[in-house]
């Protein structure tokens, strides 16, 4: 027992000496490093850094405080000391401490840049946020209601309903068939005889100051064909029939027309021939050439083709 007690006393004394030696050595090493950092900090940091350098310089009275703080770490804290294996050198320590200080002061500047950029980005996001937030609210509100869906379908139905009448109301291209009755010689037609013959053949003076052939001989009903002045201005307007004269009149009908187009054409041709016979004139085609059987066949063929194209 006495031997064991002696061994424990020796081991405890050695441990205490080792801790004291370790504390003295580390305090001297830090004192040299802080002393070497002082000139470099004045060159690099200017007037604002002496405060920090003064903080690093500790008086001799503080060594006891440092020694007391160094007694607290356990044996695991000795790993950095054992792994370094390098005795402190003031020149090397000055370089490392200078680099550390540069890194310490460079990082806050970089962080400041980041914070400025983040602040600007946050400000831009705050400015843009209301525009992007309000629009979805306006769009989402109608989408949540079912009547909008009904309106969409009803809109499509109205489009279909509009397309059908348009397809039904598309009219074929208007065509005009023209016949002319021209005086045989140099003597023009006199209004008295001309108007009397026209009235006897069922023509009635009416709209646009020209004569019309209606479905009813009394001048009522749909217009089948019309008769105008062959000469300028084209009207048959007159105050005194005896003072009116013209070298010819023009019969015309349109395609499509009311009733049967071929029957209307035959009636128009028959009326033109009667008036030409009454006045001693000639029946001409649309180009003011004498009417021929071939040209009459061309008129009838035009009517048949028009009916077939619009059947």
From Swiss-Prot:
Gene3D superfamilies the record matches: ZipA, C-terminal FtsZ-binding domain (3.30.1400.10)
Family membership: Belongs to the ZipA family.
Keywords, comma-separated and alphabetical: Cell cycle, Cell division, Cell inner membrane, Cell membrane, Membrane, Transmembrane, Transmembrane helix
Record organism: Vibrio vulnificus (strain CMCP6)
Residue ranges crossing the lipid bilayer per the database entry: 6-26
GO cellular component terms, semicolon-separated: cell division site; plasma membrane
Topological category with respect to the lipid bilayer: Single-pass type I membrane protein
Signal peptide region: none
Role this protein plays: Essential cell division protein that stabilizes the FtsZ protofilaments by cross-linking them and that serves as a cytoplasmic membrane anchor for the Z ring. Also required for the recruitment to the septal ring of downstream cell division proteins.
Name of the molecule in the record: Cell division protein ZipA
Gene Ontology process terms (BP): division septum assembly; FtsZ-dependent cytokinesis
Coiled-coil ranges (or none): none
Lineage, uppermost ranks: Bacteria, Pseudomonadati, Pseudomonadota, Gammaproteobacteria, Vibrionales
